[in-house]
C-alpha cells in the first residue's frame, strides 16, 4: 500500500535543516559570528566552554534587533538581508537564507538579549526551537546569544563529534579565517576562560596574521596586490622558505567571505611554482573583491564553496601577481640560529675586505631591525610572550622600491668560492657573509631555465642524425603516441611511422646534448606516456625539469675552484636563482653579524 505524502512539522523541518547547517559546535560559532559581522559589529567576543558542547556565548556591539522582530528571527527563512529573487544574485552579506537561528535553536537551549540602543532591549529564551519566554529588559546596544546543551535532543549527532581538542581546533580555524577576512573587526576568543585569540580591529591585515600565525611569520610576509576590470586582489604572501605540509594555511577570501576553491588554490600553487619543495604548501592570505553578480554563494549549505563565472581569469591574475611579487625579491634564506635571539646592541664588527669585491647595490629588506612596540591584549587576554600582537610593523612595498632604485641585473651578489664540503656543497664568501650552495640544485636551476626556454621556442633548427633512431613500442603506447605526434613535435620529438608499432627519428633539435640524443628522446617520450593526458604546457615543464635534474652535476662530485667560480657566476644570471625546479633551496646565507654572534664577538 502506498504511503501518504504529508507535510513535515516545523520542528522536524528545523531539525533536518540543522543537520545541514549545524554539523558541530564550530558551525554554531560560524553562523552566529557571521550574523554579528552582518550587523555591523566592530567588537565581537566569543566565549566557549568545553569546545562548545557546554556553552557558546557570542557578544557583539552591532545594530541589534527590534523588539517586534525578535520572535520572527527564529522562523525558517526569515531574514532582513534579501527581499526578492534579484537580491539573491547580489548578496553583500555573509548570511541571507534565514536558516541559522532556527536551526541552532532547534537542537539546543538558546537565549538572546538584543537592543538597537534606541528602545528597551528584548530577551528571548528557546528550548528545542520552542519559545519559552520573551520579555523586555535593559540592554546595551548589540546582541548577546548564549547556546547551551547543544544536540541535547539529537543524541545521535553527538556520536559523530570528535575529541574536545579537535572540536576546539575546528572553532579556532573558523575564527582565524573570519579574523583574516575582517581585520577591521576586533575578535576576542577565549576557551574555558583562557584567551586564545585577540585582534585589535584596526584594519591592518598583517597584524591579524601576526596574532594568528605569530610575529615571525608576519615578518616573513610581503604585500601582494593586483587589479583587473573584474577583480581587485590584496593580501600577504609569506616567503617560500616558510611553508607547511598541508593547504590549511592558504586563505582565499571573496567579498569578506572565506571560501574553498580548488582552482584558486591551484593558481596560488602555480604562483609559487619551483619556489616550494614538492609536497609543501605556502602561507598566504588573499582578499578578493568582485561584483557579487559574478559569484554565486548559494551552492553550498555552509556557503564555503562558491561558483565563479570568471574563475580562469581570476586564477591567471593570482598566479601572475605572486610570481611578480617574488621576482622582485632576493630570496636567499638566512641560516637559522638555534636559540631565540633577543634584541642586543651591535658592537663594532671586524671589517672584512675583498680586493675583488665591487660595490653592491643595496637589496630591500622586508623589515627593519628597529624595536617593534608590543601590544598587550586586555579584558579577555593576559600577557603572554607568544600572544603579543604587533601594534606597528614596518611595511615593505616592492613597487615603491622599484620606482626609486635601479634594479640590479643579478638577483644575488658576487660570491667567491673558498672550498667544497663533502663534494656536495660549495662554500663562498663576500662582504655580506658566508654562503652555502647546493651544487646540484644550482646547476639544476641553470639547466632548467635553459631547457625551459629552448623547449618553448619550438625551434626548427634540426641536427640530422647520421644513423636514424628506430623506436618500438607496445601497441597501446604506439596508438597514444600516434595521436600526440603534433604535441611531441613542439618539444623537439619528430616521429615518423616506420613499420608495425615503430617510429623512426631522423633529426633532433640542435640543443640536445651530444651523444645523448637517443637517451634524451626516450626520456621525453616516457614523460609524455606517463601522463594520463598530454598538455603541451605541462609536457614542456615536466621535460625541462626532468632533463635539468638528470643532466646536472650530482652530490659527491669534486669541483675545481674554476668550476665553482663558473657555476656561481652562471647562477647569478638565472631569473630565479634561489630554488631548484623542485622547490629546494639553492643557497643559504649566514650574515657576518650572525656568525660573529655565534662566536660571541658581538654582545
From Swiss-Prot:
Any one GO CC term of this protein is: mismatch repair complex
**MF annotations from Gene Ontology:** ATP binding; ATP hydrolysis activity; ATP-dependent DNA damage sensor activity; mismatched DNA binding
Single biological process term from Gene Ontology: mismatch repair
> What domain of life?
Bacteria
CDD domains membership: HATPase_MutL-MLH-PMS-like (cd16926), MutL_Trans (cd00782)
Alphabetized Pfam families for the sequence: DNA_mis_repair, HATPase_c_3, MutL_C
UniProt keyword terms in alphabetical order: DNA damage, DNA repair
- Function comment: This protein is involved in the repair of mismatches in DNA. It is required for dam-dependent methyl-directed DNA mismatch repair. May act as a 'molecular matchmaker', a protein that promotes the formation of a stable complex between two or more DNA-binding proteins in an ATP-dependent manner without itself being part of a final effector complex.
PANTHER family from the xrefs? DNA MISMATCH REPAIR PROTEIN MLH, PMS, MUTL, DNA MISMATCH REPAIR PROTEIN MLH1
Tell me which family the UniProt entry assigns to this protein.
Answer: Belongs to the DNA mismatch repair MutL/HexB family.
Which named protein is this? DNA mismatch repair protein MutL
Amino acid at each position: 500500500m502506498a504511503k501518504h505524502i504529508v507535510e513535515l512539522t516545523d520542528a522536524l523541518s528545523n531539525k533536518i535543516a540543522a543537520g545541514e547547517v549545524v554539523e558541530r559546535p564550530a558551525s554554531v560559532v560560524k553562523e552566529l559570528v557571521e550574523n554579528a559581522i552582518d550587523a555591523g559589529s566592530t567588537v565581537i567576543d566569543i566565549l566557549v566552554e568545553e569546545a562548545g558542547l557546554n556553552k557558546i556565548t557570542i557578544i557583539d556591539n552591532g545594530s541589534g534587533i527590534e523588539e517586534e522582530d525578535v520572535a520572527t528571527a527564529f522562523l525558517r527563512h526569515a531574514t532582513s538581508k534579501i527581499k526578492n529573487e534579484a537580491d539573491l544574485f547580489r548578496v553583500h552579506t555573509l548570511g541571507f537564507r534565514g536558516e541559522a537561528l532556527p536551526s541552532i535553536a532547534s537542537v539546543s537551549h538558546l537565549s538572546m538579549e538584543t537592543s538597537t540602543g534606541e528602545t528597551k532591549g528584548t530577551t528571548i529564551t528557546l528550548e528545542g526551537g520552542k519559545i519559552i519566554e520573551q520579555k523586555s529588559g535593559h540592554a546595551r546596544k548589540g546582541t548577546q546569544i548564549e547556546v547551551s546543551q547543544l544536540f541535547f535532543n539529537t543524541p545521535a549527532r553527538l556520536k559523530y563529534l570528535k575529541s574536545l581538542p579537535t572540536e576546539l581546533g575546528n572553532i579556532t580555524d573558523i575564527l582565524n579565517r573570519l579574523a583574516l577576512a575582517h581585520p577591521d573587526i576586533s575578535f576576542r576568543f577565549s576557551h574555558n576562560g583562557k584567551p586564545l585569540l585577540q585582534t585589535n580591529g584596526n584594519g591592518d591585515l598583517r597584524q591579524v596574521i601576526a596574532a594568528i600565525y605569530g610575529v615571525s611569520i608576519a615578518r616573513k610576509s610581503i604585500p601582494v596586490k593586483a587589479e583587473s576590470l573584474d577583480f581587485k586582489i590584496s593580501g600577504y604572501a609569506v616567503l617560500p622558505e616558510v611553508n607547511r605540509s598541508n593547504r590549511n594555511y592558504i586563505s582565499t577570501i571573496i567579498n569578506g567571505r572565506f571560501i574553498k576553491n580548488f582552482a584558486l588554490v591551484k593558481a596560488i600553487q602555480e604562483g609559487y611554482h619551483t619556489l616550494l619543495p614538492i609536497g609543501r604548501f605556502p602561507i598566504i592570505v588573499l582578499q578578493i573583491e568582485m561584483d557579487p553578480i559574478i559569484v554565486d554563494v548559494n551552492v553550498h549549505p555552509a556557503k564555503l564553496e562558491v561558483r565563479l563565472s570568471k574563475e580562469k581569469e581570476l586564477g591567471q591574475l593570482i598566479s601572475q601577481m605572486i610570481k611578480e611579487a617574488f621576482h622582485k625579491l632576493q630570496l636567499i634564506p638566512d641560516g637559522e640560529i638555534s636559540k631565540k635571539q633577543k634584541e642586543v646592541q651591535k658592537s663594532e664588527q671586524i671589517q672584512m675586505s675583498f680586493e675583488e669585491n665591487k660595490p653592491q647595490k643595496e637589496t630591500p629588506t622586508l623589515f627593519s631591525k628597529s624595536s617593534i612596540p608590543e601590544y598587550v591584549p586586555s579584558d579577555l587576554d593576559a600577557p603572554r610572550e607568544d600572544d603579543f600582537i604587533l601594534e606597528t610593523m614596518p611595511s615593505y612595498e616592492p613597487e615603491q622600491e622599484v620606482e626609486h632604485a635601479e634594479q640590479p641585473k643579478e638577483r644575488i651578489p658576487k660570491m667567491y668560492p673558498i672550498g667544497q664540503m663533502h663534494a656536495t656543497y660549495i662554500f663562498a664568501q663576500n662582504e655580506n657573509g658566508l654562503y652555502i650552495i647546493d651544487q646540484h640544485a644550482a646547476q639544476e636551476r641553470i639547466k632548467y631555465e635553459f631547457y625551459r626556454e629552448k623547449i618553448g621556442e619550438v625551434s626548427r633548427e634540426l641536427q640530422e642524425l647520421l644513423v636514424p633512431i628506430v623506436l618500438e613500442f607496445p601497441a597501446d603506447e604506439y596508438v597514444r603516441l600516434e595521436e600526440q605526434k603534433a604535441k611531441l613535435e613542439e618539444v623537439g620529438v619528430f616521429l615518423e611511422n616506420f613499420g608495425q608499432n615503430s617510429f623512426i627519428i631522423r633529426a633532433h633539435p640542435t640543443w640536445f646534448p651530444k651523444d645523448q640524443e637517443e637517451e634524451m628522446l626516450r626520456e621525453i617520450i616516457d614523460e609524455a606516456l606517463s601522463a594520463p593526458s598530454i598538455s603541451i604546457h605541462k609536457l614542456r615543464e615536466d621535460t625541462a625539469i626532468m632533463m635539468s635534474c638528470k643532466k646536472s652535476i650530482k652530490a659527491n662530485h669534486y669541483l675545481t675552484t674554476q668550476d665553482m667560480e663558473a657555476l656561481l657566476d652562471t647562477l647569478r644570471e638565472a631569473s630565479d636563482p634561489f630554488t631548484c625546479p623542485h622547490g629546494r633551496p639553492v643557497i643559504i646565507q649566514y650574515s657576518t653579524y650572525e656568525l660573529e654572534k655565534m662566536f660571541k664577538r658581538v654582545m
